[in-house]
Curated annotation (Swiss-Prot):
PROSITE patterns: ACT (PS51671). Disulfide bonds: none annotated. Gene3D superfamilies: 3.30.70.260. It comes from the Bacteria. It comes from Acetivibrio thermocellus (strain ATCC 27405 / DSM 1237 / JCM 9322 / NBRC 103400 / NCIMB 10682 / NRRL B-4536 / VPI 7372). SUPFAM superfamilies: ACT-like (SSF55021). It holds the Pfam family ACT_4. InterPro entries: ACT-like_dom_sf, ACT_dom, UPF0735_ACT_dom-cont. The lineage of its organism: Bacteria, Bacillati, Bacillota, Clostridia, Eubacteriales. This is UPF0735 ACT domain-containing protein Cthe_1377. Residues 71-146 form the ACT domain.
Length: 147
């Protein structure tokens, strides 16, 4: 017999507080701020049994419609610190970096893809790309995908 799960998207304001506290305890544990379940449940104010009862059944919903998810592609020269410079420009614009992938340099050039969430960005994506293109060693850039 198959156990099929059903999922519902529910506004947090109507959920029993225990669910919100379980999610908060999971977040605290995942961040490493607290190392064990006892301390985490004590901090958020729930019992261990409530935590264990719900921990595998409640998850936060990350709203990607708040901001678009954009995948950027760069070809960069093999300079020490060039990836760090690109990441710093993205961070300065308050974009949320989701993934970074850098290939091994071949003939002095490396391909880099960075996926960002733009919901909290403080400037236009075009301005960000113009800023990144001014970094010495950035040879090519493009937007690969938008969601």
């Amino acid at each position: 017999m198959r156990n099929t799960s059903k999922y519902y998207l529910v506004d947090a304001s109507v959920l029993p507080k225990v669910f919100i506290k379980v999610v908060e305890a999971k977040r605290i544990l995942a961040s490493g701020a607290i190392k064990n379940v006892n301390e985490a449940v004590r901090k958020v104010g729930i019992s261990r049994s409530a935590y264990y009862k719900y921990k595998d059944h409640i998850f936060p919903f990350y709203e990607t419609s708040q901001g678009k998810v954009i995948t950027l592609f760069f070809t960069v020269e093999d300079y020490a610190g060039i990836l760090s410079s690109i990441i710093n420009r993205i961070a300065d614009s308050k974009a949320n970096i989701i993934t970074i992938n850098q290939n091994i340099p071949i003939n002095g050039l490396a391909d880099v893809t960075i996926t960002i969430e733009t919901g909290q960005m403080t400037r236009d994506i075009k301005d960000l790309l113009d800023d990144i293109s001014s970094i010495e060693g950035v040879k090519r850039q493009e937007i690969l995908a938008r969601e």
